[in-house]
């Protein structure tokens, strides 16, 4: 198994994407600490991977003291951290009509929570001389607003990718890798969204593969990126957009 004897933390583990990554880590042999804001959602994920759960904790990933206390509560090594915490975003409004607060909010959210979680764990990883920090971006970081009015979400994702590169440059000498995942829209993370058929068709036609990524695929890619097989990869953004964005 790719992650046997590894210890991972997943922030935002109660969400669809965080849960998918937690399950993938568990399937590859990791002990997984689940953290998020809603206990019931975390417990639902924990019930799927009972043998792999290290702990379940209610943690506000926007609060530095909450995250620092959580990291300190975990004994021994921390090999992997993944942040899947959602941001507050207003979309489907033209930029020229969007308020400053609505534009800036997702950028602040993304920068704050990823900075807090990654630096809290990086301090431990620097001491132990190794580890992997994973962040979640989106193809929105590379797309225009010609088809969809994304508000501040594009800039939020771009900030995550910038942080990935900056942190990778700083902590690499300690054996710590930093990688971002950039999927396109994943329909199975939002089954409650009623997307019109023509809208979904437009999304499909905009990809080289003619389909959209699935959350399980993102989870398995995260597991690979966190494994020793991906040892040379750092400061990189893994393109999981099915070709919606071509690097």
Give short role names for the model-derived ranges.
Residues 87, 134-159, 164-173, 185-186:
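Catalytic loop of short-chain dehydrogenase/reductase
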Residues 223, 234-247:
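Short C-terminal tail/terminal secondary-structure segment
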Residues 86-104, 147-152, 192-195:
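Conserved mid-core segment of classical short-chain dehydrogenase/reductases
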Residues 123, 169-170, 231:
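Alpha-helical segment proximal to the catalytic Tyr-Lys
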Residues 172-177, 233-235:
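Short, small/polar-rich loop/turn modules that mediate ligand/substrate recognition or access, typified
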Residues 149, 173, 180-207, 217:
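A glycine/serine/threonine-rich, flexible loop-to-helix segment
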Residues 96-116, 130, 134, 160:
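Catalytic Tyr-X3-Lys loop
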Residues 14-15:
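Conserved glycine-rich cofactor-binding loop
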